Design a protein with these regions (language model features):
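Well-ordered alpha-helical scaffold segments within catalytic/enzyme domains
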Residues: 138-149
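Extracellular/oxidizing-compartment recognition motifs
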Residues: 1-125, 134-135, 149-160
Length: 160
């Protein structure tokens, strides 16, 4: 997540992330276990761009808890979501007349991107982002159809 802000020194940008809402439409983060899924930035004076370098979040929804100048100053162009994933050449594509199938394939691609950050994980949003061997071996054929993942898997297996 990259933020483009204009603020005064000491003002705060505070965001929370979630992938689902509960039945009442509230943020639901119990599935994150102990992961905080928070983005807290203290501004300096003037225009600024902030992009964390040591973390990432898996999310569908963002809640703005605090914003420089007040919540009423929030605009969509203040935020850019960035897909963080290992660099692999895309090799597999699917497009057909069935919109549901096209969406399913798109979700598979995005799921792979979100779970291929140096190691193959089973979820990018929780407190554990470990390269479990079971998930990786079940998905390897699909992964290699979607992307040229040979170097990715070779590196990961050597690390084991």
């Amino acid at each position: 997540m990259e933020s483009h802000l204009e603020g005064k020194a000491g003002e705060v940008l505070d965001l929370s992330f979630a992938e689902v809402m509960d039945k009442e439409g509230n943020f639901y983060t119990e599935n994150y276990r102990s992961a905080k899924a928070r983005y807290h930035y203290i501004c300096r004076d003037g225009k600024q761009t902030y992009k964390p370098k040591l973390t990432f979040w898996g999310f569908r929804y963002i809640r703005v808890n605090a914003f420089p100048g007040g919540i009423d100053k929030v605009t969509l162009d203040a935020f850019t979501a960035i897909a963080v994933h290992s660099d692999m050449k895309r090799t597999g594509y699917l497009s057909c007349s069935n919109n549901s199938l096209n969406k399913l394939f798109s979700n598979i691609i995005w799921g792979q991107k979100g779970n291929f950050v140096d190691v193959p994980t089973d979820c990018p949003q929780r407190d554990e982002r470990l390269g479990w061997t079971g998930d990786a071996q079940v998905f390897i054929r699909t992964a290699c159809l979607n992307y040229d993942a040979e170097k990715f898997y070779t590196k990961w297996l050597a690390d084991l």
